[in-house]
Swiss-Prot record:
It comes from Streptococcus pneumoniae serotype 2 (strain D39 / NCTC 7466). It is found in: Cytoplasm. The gene is grpE. Signal peptide: none annotated. This is Protein GrpE. Residues 26-35 have a biased composition (Basic and acidic residues). The keyword DNA repair does not apply. One of its GO terms (molecular function) is unfolded protein binding. Disulfide bonds: none annotated.
Amino acid sequence: MAQDIKNEEVEEVQEEEVVETAEETTPEKSELDLANERADEFENKYLRAHAEMQNIQRRANEERQNLQRYRSQDLAKAILPSLDNLERALAVEGLTDDVKKGLAMVQESLIHALKEEGIEEIAADGEFDHNYHMAIQTLPGDDEHPVDTIAQVFQKGYKLHDRILRPAMVVVYN
């Protein structure tokens, strides 16, 4: 019996040690788990911040390229009325040949400078395209003049690369 009591006491002490050991192990695991979770959280934040920085750099690069590509847009819009006036002046009757030749040279040099900057005249013949043309008047269409074709150009249109500076103002058969 004394042996049984000693065995029971030893078993109780061993059970208490096992419970204490298990309790000691659990906090260590939870601290390790917490540290791993925090490390994962910091890594996730780092990856997000890195991706955001790359996006900011990419957007800044694209914006810089667009500014460079369309830098002459405002100047071209300011020059286009002068180019229109030169064209009207060349159409006036009674000018001497020397004056017409001088006006034509100025017009050609302006057109050349605009082309070097990527500015092109919008084609205003054939079919009407609402992306490039502005209908300011319509005429009835017939067999000779199909519907949605351009009858006359009142003012030339221009574009800078893929951006419309000014649509061509046209008369359209309807």
